[in-house]
Amino acid sequence: MREIVHLQTGQCGNQIGAAFWQTISGEHGLDGSGVYNGTSDLQLERMNVYFNEASNNKFVPRAVLVDLEPGTMDAVRAGPFGQLFRPDNFVFGQSGAGNNWAKGHYTEGAELVDQVLDVVRREAEGCDCLQGFQITHSLGGGTGAGMGTLLISKIREEFPDRMMATYSVVPSPKVSDTVVEPYNATLSIHQLVENSDETFCIDNEALYDICMRTLKLNNPSYGDLNHLVSAVMSGVTTCLRFPGQLNSDLRKLAVNMVPFPRLHFFMVGFAPLTSRGAHSFRAVTVPELTQQMFDPKNMMAASDFRNGRYLTCSAYFRGKVSMKEVEDQMRNVQNKNSSYFVEWIPNNVQTALCSIPPRGLKMSSTFVGNSTSIQELFKRVGDQFTAMFRRKAFLHWYTGEGMDEMEFTEAESNMNDLVSEYQQYQEASVSEGEEEYDEEAPLEAEE
């Protein structure tokens, strides 16, 4: 079967990862110690994508947990699903990276990386037919960003033909955890552009907004945010974990979603999002799901797709949904909003169906979009980076670990290139001869 090996690095990565395993264990009928209590054969059929069956009917996640300090690991171990993971798969250092990308990528992280790769190799050897890797991390810190990208490039070297998907928490515009976030993020994106096949961008602020605006939570905790992320991760991987009519795997997703190799940064969304109290008062319909899914307020990254155009997007519907209704709704969305889709990729919306809904819902949908408006996010980080780098603020922390200023300049220009590539495809039209301007685009849609 097509297995996926999961890595989680750094504090953020481990917390999101833990939430993800909790969600999918529930969907597959596993309790906190990995014993199967489910009712449906469908839960077992493709269990081995993410789980390894050990002796005495215990299922063990194919997960590698990495951090440069023991704190977060202990928290995961003490959590409700701490007994699920294989004890040898916890790899941690003692020093911490202190939010310093260079420590994670070049010094502390580099010392630990071989240990991690041994565990990854062992997990990969336990697979019949390894499909690829997924990694959860944040781009603003030291371990997840620095060491996470180091792991990605090492795994790339060793498994060049396997898919690499990353769930990356990008720095948010207003909520900043650390001052050097723009440095860490720019250096990380520099790596991801080259080494990842698909990157799902998630951002804390957008998650906060969803919690406050849609879920009506007054002061959302990180637990609530991680719960949202795990819902999306569960949705994106649905087709791999359950038999569906329209199946999709990491490679198919990439083939359908990435028109140009560098442009593989996706926005994700999830529907239905309703406040906890309102669940029982409304039935969810396919049109509602579709509408909510394409709503900018539902996107988990702070960029508004109305400022750009979709190159491609894909929607995963779960539950008892009629194929025809889904097709009609998706066509409807494309016709009504044709100005938001590039016209030089004719069938750029792809749908996949799976008959098993998430726990507690009749149906749900997950949205993955490759929109040129994601450049807002990179622009924002780039501007902050430039402001600090021009004054060489905080640079000594990085050069002290052996980094060169040249690397910063390279990362900066790579990110600027990425932004202008997105912009170029946003403005491109079918007939390249006549320049088409954005001001005219909305009018065409209304005629």
Curated annotation (Swiss-Prot):
Annotated spans, Disordered: 424-447
SMART domains per UniProt: Tubulin (SM00864), Tubulin_C (SM00865)
Protein location: Cytoplasm, Cytoskeleton
MF annotations from Gene Ontology: GTP binding; GTPase activity; metal ion binding; structural constituent of cytoskeleton
CC annotations in GO: cytoplasm; microtubule
Cofactor: Mg(2+)
Binding site for GTP: 11, 69, 138, 142-144, 204, 226
Database matches in PROSITE patterns: TUBULIN, TUBULIN_B_AUTOREG
Alphabetically ordered keywords of this record: Cytoplasm, Cytoskeleton, GTP-binding, Magnesium, Metal-binding, Microtubule, Nucleotide-binding
Alphabetized SUPFAM superfamilies for the sequence: Tubulin C-terminal domain-like, Tubulin nucleotide-binding domain-like
InterPro entries for this protein: Beta-tubulin_BS (IPR013838), Beta_tubulin (IPR002453), Tub_FtsZ_C (IPR008280), Tubulin (IPR000217), Tubulin/FtsZ-like_C (IPR037103), Tubulin/FtsZ_2-layer-sand-dom (IPR018316), Tubulin/FtsZ_GTPase_sf (IPR036525), Tubulin_C (IPR023123)
Acidic residues bias spans: 432-447
UniProt record, GO biological process: microtubule-based process
Main location: cytoplasm
Xref: Gene3D superfamilies: Helix hairpin bin, Tubulin/FtsZ, C-terminal domain, Tubulin/FtsZ, GTPase domain
Organism superkingdom: Eukaryota
Residue numbers binding Mg(2+): 69
PANTHER family according to UniProt: TUBULIN
Function of the protein: Tubulin is the major constituent of microtubules, a cylinder consisting of laterally associated linear protofilaments composed of alpha- and beta-tubulin heterodimers. Microtubules grow by the addition of GTP-tubulin dimers to the microtubule end, where a stabilizing cap forms. Below the cap, tubulin dimers are in GDP-bound state, owing to GTPase activity of alpha-tubulin.
Recorded family membership: Belongs to the tubulin family.
Subunit structure: Dimer of alpha and beta chains. A typical microtubule is a hollow water-filled tube with an outer diameter of 25 nm and an inner diameter of 15 nM. Alpha-beta heterodimers associate head-to-tail to form protofilaments running lengthwise along the microtubule wall with the beta-tubulin subunit facing the microtubule plus end conferring a structural polarity. Microtubules usually have 13 protofilaments but different protofilament numbers can be found in some organisms and specialized cells.
Name listed for the protein in its UniProt record: Tubulin beta chain
The gene coding this protein: TUB1
